[in-house]
Structures are given as structure tokens and as C-alpha cells.
Amino acid sequence: MQARDVILRPIITESSMAGADRKVYQFEVNRKATKTDVKVAVADVFGVTVKKVNIANVRGKNKRMGRYQGLTRNRKKATVSLTADSKDIEVFKNQEENK
């Protein structure tokens, strides 16, 4: 799997932005990706050193539209911790400046 196929998008929430100060970032990743895949992809794409990767499978929520019901899609969320000497990831830094 290519590095660009592993990381789908960054997760930008209040809690993820609070973690960015401690060099902890969250990404939505491919559902077939492993911790090792995520570690290699983040290191390649952003040029940083990864300390630890935690992964959580997030189930889709039940949604209704009138009498029709369905589910949002399932996703996989990766929390990536960087080493202290790594540089910050620019995607999250730009979001902090816009607030």
C-alpha cells in the first residue's frame, strides 16, 4: 500500500488540536492499514519521526431520514505521537492560526 493511500485525511476537532501542542495528531486512515503502515506513511509524507501509533475502529452511526434509515460508514482513526525532536505537522499548525 502506498503512503498516500494509507492516510485519508487529518481529523480536525477541538480535542485533536489540543493534542497537537503535545505532538499528538489524529488521522483518518485506510480501513486495511496497520500500525506499521501508518507509522511508515506519516514518516514519509510529513518527514517526521513517529514514536507511537494507536488505532481505533469507529463504527458508523445510525441515521434516519423520515421513514428510511441507514448507517454512516465505518472508519479507522489513528492517533500518532511524535518524538520530542520532530518538527510539527504543518496541516494542524495552519488550522490553529486560523482560529
UniProtKB/Swiss-Prot annotation:
Entry superkingdom: Bacteria
Swiss-Prot/TrEMBL keywords: Ribonucleoprotein, Ribosomal protein, RNA-binding, rRNA-binding
GO biological process, any: translation
GO molecular function: rRNA binding; structural constituent of ribosome
Segments traversing the membrane: none
InterPro entries: Nucleotide-bd_a/b_plait_sf, Ribosomal_uL23-like, Ribosomal_uL23/eL15/eS24_sf
GO cellular component, one term: ribosome
Protein family per UniProt: Belongs to the universal ribosomal protein uL23 family.
Subunit structure comment from the entry: Part of the 50S ribosomal subunit. Contacts protein L29, and trigger factor when it is bound to the ribosome.
Job of this protein: One of the early assembly proteins it binds 23S rRNA. One of the proteins that surrounds the polypeptide exit tunnel on the outside of the ribosome. Forms the main docking site for trigger factor binding to the ribosome.
Protein name (record): Large ribosomal subunit protein uL23
Organism: Oenococcus oeni (strain ATCC BAA-331 / PSU-1)
This protein's encoding gene: rplW
